[in-house]
């Protein structure tokens, strides 16, 4: 891209990652902004086409023109983000929060589903029923949609009294130190630059060798094999 940089151009990043960790050399006489959709790429396209839109973070990394923020907001409007709301922040906010989801929150979610599948099938429950209850029915997707609309706990009004009591009682029980430590380790790996160093090496030195191995391992777990069997039966 560097040969195409000219004075006065606007350079936009859809993520703050490479800006936070200084992995790119910015053109000195140009506006550099971030319009970062809070949505997966496929969802960005589908929600743009449908007219629904999606939220986004917006920030300015470099303001050569004095109008960089206005340009960034206009870009957010053009891609459909203003229909759901644009939050102005700084580059590091987007990077840290995005990576915390990827390094901290989602791995815990995957662990919970995988362990629940293992335990429930060991207790003799049919694997197809376990998967359907967990997420194949898309009830969980509806739950999270309602959490986004109503609030994490306010969506509980849609559940039966039994479900409300069970969830709230267990939410207040147990020792959260393991979860806290897991999340804190993730945050420290971001703040120290340890994760970026590891990821840069994975891309340049190892040519994604470890990523390929991790994907292969995940796709050969018992839960993935059970998913394949259930999908074949549902066709």
Each model region followed by its residue ranges:
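Short, conserved loop/helix-junction motifs that constitute active-site signature segments
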Residues: 1-7, 25-29
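Flexible, active-site-adjacent loop/turn segments at secondary-structure boundaries
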Residues: 3, 19, 89, 94-98, ...
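Active-site-proximal catalytic alpha-helix in oxidoreductases
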Residues: 52, 66-80, 84-124, 128-148
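Residue-level marker of alpha-helix boundaries and capping positions
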Residues: 63, 107, 176-177
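NAD(P)-dependent Rossmann-like dehydrogenase/reductase catalytic/cofactor-binding core
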Residues: 125-235
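A broad, structural surface signal
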Residues: 3, 114, 118, 181-188
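Rossmann-fold dinucleotide-binding core
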Residues: 12-100
């Amino acid at each position: 891209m560097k040969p195409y940089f000219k004075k006065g151009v606007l350079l936009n990043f859809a993520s703050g990652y490479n800006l936070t960790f200084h992995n790119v050399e910015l053109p000195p006489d140009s506006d550099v902004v971030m319009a970062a959709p809070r949505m997966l790429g496929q969802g960005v396209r589908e929600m743009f086409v449908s007219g629904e839109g999606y939220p986004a973070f917006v920030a300015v990394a470099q303001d050569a023109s004095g109008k960089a923020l206005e340009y960034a907001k206009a870009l957010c409007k053009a891609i459909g983000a203003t229909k759901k709301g644009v939050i102005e922040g700084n580059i590091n906010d987007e990077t840290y929060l995005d990576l915390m989801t990827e390094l901290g929150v989602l791995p815990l979610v995957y662990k919970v589903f995988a362990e629940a599948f293992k335990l429930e099938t060991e207790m003799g429950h049919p694997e197809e029923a376990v998967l359907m209850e967990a997420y194949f029915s898309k009830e969980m997707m509806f739950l999270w949609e309602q959490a986004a609309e109503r609030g994490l706990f306010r969506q509980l009004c849609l559940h039966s009294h039994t479900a409300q009591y069970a969830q709230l009682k267990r939410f207040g029980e147990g020792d959260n130190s393991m979860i806290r430590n897991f999340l804190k380790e993730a945050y420290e790996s971001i703040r120290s630059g340890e994760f970026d160093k590891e990821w840069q090496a994975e891309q340049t030195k190892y040519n994604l060798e470890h990523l390929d191995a991790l994907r292969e391992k995940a796709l050969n777990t018992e839960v993935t094999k059970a998913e394949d069997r259930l999908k074949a039966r549902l066709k």
